[in-house]
Amino acid sequence: MFGFKTTKNKKRVRLLVVAIGVMIFFMCLSNFSSIQSRQSSSTDTPLQQNGKHQVIRVLETQPSININNSENNINNENINNNQNNNPNNNMDNNNKNNNKNNNIDNNNNKNNNNNDNIDNNINNNNNNNNNNNNINNNNNINNNNNIDNTDNNINNNINNNNININNNNKPSYKKPEKKPPLSSSQIFFNSLPPHIQKQVVIREKSNYAQALQYDSYGIVPAKDFFDGLDAVFETKPNYKISTVRKLFNIENLNSNNNNNNNNNNNNNNNNNNNNNYDINNYNNINIKEDDKFENKNYQNGDKNIMYSDYKGIDYGNNNNIEEIERIKEELKIELEKENVNDIFKYRVTIVTQTTVDRLYKVAAMAERWRSPISVSLFIKSQGDIDKLEKAISANKILATFADFHLFYHNNTRYPVNNLRNLAIRNALTEHVLLLDVDFIPPSHLHDHIAHYINLNYLNQDDSLNAFVIPSFSSNLQPKDIPDSKFEFIEMLTKNKIEPSNLKVCPKCHSPTDYTRWMTSTEPYAIEYHWIYEPFLVYNRSQTLPFDERFKGYGFDKNSQIFGMAAQGFTFSVLPEAYIVHINHPTSRWDGPSLDDQQWDSLRVVCDLLPEIRKRYAKGYKVDRLFDEPTTENCYSNDHW
């Protein structure tokens, strides 16, 4: 019996042990689940800040959770939280609430999530909380989770006020805006003396995109064909150390002395033979600024006087009464010395272009011409400006008759047509004579041309007429070029002078008919042929500007003459007129060869010819206007 009871007790003990083990297992399982649940709802991240550990709780918000508006008053605030699970979250708050119980006190909002109280204290001063999540409280709380107060939903972007929490270890300051680098033209402009800067106009350009226009043949010119059109400096030659020609306006010499307003609008009849000037009332002569001068009124005789001052006054300040009075005194002397018809003696301006190393050629031209010259200078550096100022301060003739206008480029081929247009725009008369800087005119040329301009004016001939000036070349020195046609022809017969380029390009000048010119005593008309490129006198207001797509060498001038012929110009050779090119060694140019430059210019010509035909064909479709190449055979050598 005893043995039986012992066995039965052992079984009971075993069952009790098993029951206790099962209970312990389920208790452990329950505790484990509770811990795991808490860990999934919150993460404690220690942060070392100012020598202390601060616990930051990161709320993992679900995209769509209904929030009772009575329990959580989230008032139109956008919370933007760019979370990248960075444990180093620096919160920089003016309130500096370091709550290790994960309680952040919020005056407006209490949000209970998984029994964790998060009280966010956001004061009205929009303090920045930088938790390495850069909380930016400029009335803005962005959380990439839109909280819509109307529906009490968190929708991944909350509008109105935004807090930016950026998980970057960057300070919360606004990065200064990067200024674009200065172009070379701006750098050059900043280096100019102040008195020159005042006279400069910058026109920013970028012309490389024009290469697309020439892609029709599958070949685009080299990049330097378009480079460099970065800025244009257009200046009047009012350097303080130079002498410059000034313009004066005699309006009504019997008017009130206080009427000193540079008025161009004279209702007087324009008549060059006005003899009613009252010299004693010279005090009413008004100084007229160059840039306000309208050449066409000057040409028609509206009493504008061009006057040269030889003492280098700065005319930019008309408030200097002493200077003005002195100028008027000198003008009175000039008026007394000259015949009234001489007041309007300047009818033509030479327009030319060059670089500073050839200023001596401009001086040689001015010595013979003794009339206005408008010069465009290709400027490459501040040193060129210095050379220009030295030249015009040292040479009285250069300073008296030449007006200089600056054109600055980067690295480019010589911008010949840009320079020509600049010189033409700034010419002091409507009629211009286009010359290269290597040419020397005879001393009588201006008056000879002016005579025929006056004939057209008196006859009220407004037709499109251009005067051809026969061109020659020689190895003589400028001082040895004869001033009379008789002596000039003698040198022609001795081969000391010869017609220009007849051997190199017969078509370029042969229409001038040099044989006929040698015996002519009256102007004679000539017939235009393609690629003819004479040196012309014409009214600039009647023509279009030179095409500035041309750079370097080739077709820049004859394409302009073709446009004038298509427009309807007639060409007349003047009997006593001539110019002589002084031969010189070929200039060195660091760039493409002349053949390459000419090839690139040919591409421009082949685009330009159809444009001109379309412009002047008056609605008719024509293959050619003269004997120029058609579009199909534009690249044929037979036409060049």
Swiss-Prot record:
Highest taxon in the source lineage: Eukaryota
Extracellular side: 36-640
Residues on Cytoplasmic side: 1-14
Pfam families listed in its UniProt record: Glyco_transf_49
A single MF term (Gene Ontology): xylosyltransferase activity
GO biological process: protein O-linked mannosylation
Record localization: Membrane
Major subcellular location class: membrane
Protein name (record): Glycosyltransferase-like protein gnt14
Lineage: Eukaryota, Amoebozoa, Evosea, Eumycetozoa, Dictyostelia
Name of encoding gene: gnt14
